[in-house]
């Protein structure tokens, strides 16, 4: 198996320090002892993440550290042996970092969806703590990042076993469910040698639902849980059809939905109700009416008129008229 070069863990420590500044990030250059500072706004973070090559699921809100905060190891570091955890440029060892610092490192790489560096990071952990390094650390944040490293390195069986047998906190459910489903897609695509279409992905989701360890069992339809839909409907009927921004924030806290999702749901619901009410209030068209637009039902319809009885009735009338004529002839006065 090919050895992975050691990682510049001092740069990771810079990453740990910078995640506490939500509005400005400082970039540290490893080639110069002086620190050059430049800032970037959070609006540019998503652009930097888009080059990570990860699956197209949404970034969560743990630590938003741009991938550029974590520089590529210098040639001197890359040429070092993996057997020595000491970083020549800084003289630091991975074992000197606290659990909190390693959690910040792994979480930052996970948020950047930087699969290559995550794989190298966990290889270095294994060199220090052995093949069961993740179990040795007993940190859920590190294990969550480890699942993405398994996904990135195509270790599907290990990934599925880990996700199916370890219970995770609910705040990680969305990320882990996305990893589970994308791993199923990727595994199938590698076996078939072709891209999956939406129908095939849907069948895989139905065949391999997320395990209960990362799913509360509630069905999600169009990104809305059933309980969230019920909450929105009750609010719409009992509270207001036009919630304020503060009410939307309260709904967001109660349901876990985003403000934009809540706004769109209320807008669509108002439009549906308006369309339904318009359809109920509009008069029926004359073409669709069975009685020509009259408010009264016809006494005799063409379907109820018995044509077979018509000749019989006409004969009776004709016979009566003929008898009347013969009676008149009998009482004719001849002068």
UniProtKB/Swiss-Prot annotation:
Positions of region (Disordered): 27-56, 269-294
Biased composition (Polar residues): 42-53
Entries under Pfam families matching the protein: Homeodomain, SIX1_SD
Result of knocking out the encoding gene: RNAi-mediated knockdown results in 60% larval lethality. Surviving animals display uncoordinated locomotion, withered tail morphology, and defects in both CAN neuronal cell migration and axon guidance.
UniProt keyword annotations, A-Z: Developmental protein, DNA-binding, Homeobox, Nucleus, Transcription, Transcription regulation
GO MF entry, a single one: RNA polymerase II cis-regulatory region sequence-specific DNA binding
Biological role: Probable transcription factor required for differentiation and migration of neuronal cells, such as RID and CAN neurons. Specifically, plays a role in the terminal differentiation of RID peptidergic neurons. Also required for CAN neuron axon guidance.
Protein name: Homeobox protein unc-39
Organism ancestry: Eukaryota, Metazoa, Ecdysozoa, Nematoda, Chromadorea
Gene: unc-39
